[in-house]
Amino acid sequence: MSVRTTAFKKASSSFHDFLVSILETSVTKRDARAYINKFAPLLERKRIGFKQQTSKSVAQKDGQDEPTESTPQQPLYHDSRVAKSLSALKTLGLISIVVVDCDGVDGSDSERRRVIDAQANRIAEAIDCFDEEGAVVLGTPLTIGDSVGKGTSPYVSEDLFVTDSSSLLQSLQDEKIPVIPSVGETEQSIAYKCVDANDAVLALTRQLSGLQFLGQPMEDKHIVQQLKATEVYRLIILDPVGGVPANNRATGRYMFLNLEQEYEEVTRSLTESTLNSDSKNPGTAQENQHHLRNSQMARKALSLLPSTSSAIITTPKDAANERPQEEADSGWPYVSTRRKLNPLIHNLLTDKPAQSSSLPSGRFTPVVSSNGAAQLGSSTTLAKRGMHVTILPDPRVSMWQPPRPGEPRLRLTDASVNLPRLVHLINDSFGRKLDVEHYLKRVEENLAGIIIAGEYEGGAILTWEKPWDADPAEDVDPSRLVPYLDKFAVLRKSQGAGGVADIVFNAMVRDCFPYGVCWRSRKDNPVNKWYHERSAGSHKIPDMNWAMFWTTPDLALDEQKFQDYKSVCRSVEPSWADKKHIVD
């Protein structure tokens, strides 16, 4: 868990230098502004958020509260390095709540209790070495209800709930990092039992989010007020298996996981992989179970939190971010690698994955993995509750193809499209008003489809365009029709955050036009850097203010297709109400 604290009031020249050095090297100007705007108000108020760490990982340090788990096998080296990362996060304004996992500890409840208490104290001592206020081990703020194990909803608090918030809130007020063993006290008898760390994290999340109910004991008014002033901001899951695997990604894992859209795909893939795993390879099935638990944990916790909250799933070693310098040589010929940014700090500053999920495979920067080998992209997954993606027509039913004469086709005036919201999205994103009548007429007969993210927070309109030398009155060879991205829009409030642009772009290149698409942009458009990173190539059209981009493989080797693409990007007529076509 993570809590934004009043660490800023302790700002000094050394802290200023520390912050500036990070902002200058790790994030964009927009990221820096967003971070400062979000955390500067913490001079006057505190907020709370969660982070969790699973098997073989320990508490994390950022200025927010994070629940984390650790096991007896957790190396002391990682305790120290992760503790240092948590302290750095706290310096940046985010305090952590650490949940210590007792999974993998054998023996009776009393024996397991002794072991987990020792783990909690070890973690707290590691934090004390790096943090002025240090850590505090809390006893048993959790109570086990009579119906333990029966609850199925993250909103239900009858299985495990928080009965003593005062010690937790006091430690946060004192800017100490709470370390909580995953132990609960039974409701009807004075007995202590180990509980599932995921359940402990959910119980704390419910309490700090104001969602603990169903007849649980009422806190006094002062504590209720304090709880209302908190905000669960981040969940961190540290697990040696790392981020969520993805067979259909060049990196082999999800860099960004849109839980609303991709959770079922994740569970289906991991379940199938487990069923197909060789009996001689039990490690694969075990790892898949870890990934499933991590994904489920992220989904349940984020369902309780604001849509701006997110979960980071990474390894303890990556969270510790300790790389021997000699590991920078990956052994990959002609490719240089770089040391990875600490995913906890990078995510706090940017709320983005270390590398964008919409980059083509050739653009992922090789990095040194946790085991010292080179890999594409990061081993960390950033998960958000995300948003549903609507694609019309649905490519799962039939791949997008140019419509044949007489076939029914999608139109923007269809009941399945909310045209007023679509127009508002375009107007807001471009800062210009669309000439709706002109635009509808232009795309009426050549609309390929549309992509809508969430409640029209982002979207794309794609068309089939005829090359310049085609007779407008005659049908064109379908093979020469150009797949064209006509409009790509994200609401201004969602630009640069939340992954909306990546979600829409991924849907376009993976589901709608996997074999390639082109688009154009003004040569002086600041978004062109983003386009360059995601395209297979670009070309500045002479005598015009347009630059052409495409994702089509080997386009430059096909002269006819290249000229067709170029002619479309030259000739598509803008449909803006201000008629300032000369600007384009």
Language-model segments: residues:
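Short active-site-adjacent structural elements
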Residues: 188, 244-248, 320-324, 527-530, ...
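Nucleotide/pyrophosphate-binding catalytic subdomain
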Residues: 1-319, 412-416
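Flexible, D/E/H-enriched segments
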Residues: 257-259, 267-386
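Conserved acetyl-CoA-binding loop-helix of GNAT-fold acetyltransferases
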Residues: 496-509
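A conserved beta-strand-loop-helix scaffold within acyl/acetyltransferase catalytic domains
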Residues: 411-496
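Active-site proximal loops enriched in glycine and acidic residues that flank catalytic Cys/His/Asp
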Residues: 239, 315, 460-464, 487-489, ...
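Terminal substrate-recognition subdomain of acyl/acetyltransferases
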Residues: 336-416, 420, 425-441, 491-492, ...
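Conserved beta-strand elements of beta-rich interaction domains across eukaryotes
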Residues: 185, 242-243, 467, 524, ...
